[in-house]
C-alpha cells in the first residue's frame, strides 16, 4: 500500500482550514488511518476546529482497546464532536465553529469509511471513479429530490451550505461505508476545495495519468 497527502490554500481563501493525516502504519488498533477535515467558522475558528478534531480523533483512537474498526471510528468521531461543542461553549470566539470529516482505514481486503459533511472519499477502480460517500449538504438534497442537476450543484450559490458537521449538534450522525478492494484500486479523500473546482472526470484523469501518487496529488 502507498499513500500521499497534500493540502493547499488555493486561490480563493486567505486561510487554509483543511487538515490531512495519512498513516500507513498502525494508529492504536487500526492498521492504518487516513483523514481529511475541513473547518468552518469565523476568523480562526474553522482552522482550530479541523485541527482540534484531528487531535481528539487520534488521541481517542490511540487510547481505544476495541478491535472493531467501525466502533473505534464511531467512538472517536463522537468524542471529537463533543469536545468541539465544549470548546465552542467555553470560548465565545469559537462559537459556531465546526468541521467536516472523512476518514478511512484499510483492514485486509476492505476499506472502512466514515464521513460527516461534504468532504468526500472516491474509489478509482478499472479506470472508473465512484464517489463512495454522500454529501451532507443543501445542494445534495436538491439533487436528490430532482430540483437541480448534478452539474448545476457545482456552481450553485448555496453549494457551501452543509447539513451535518462536527460541532453542529450534540448527537452527530455519521455515515459508514465498507468497500471490498482489489489490487490496483485507489482511494481519494478530499475536501470541497477540490471538488468545487474540478470535475470527477478530471480528478480521475489526473490520478490515472500521474506516474506516482505524488504526481497525481500535485497536478
Name these PLM-found stretches.
Residues 1-219:
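PP2C/PPM-type serine/threonine phosphatase catalytic domain
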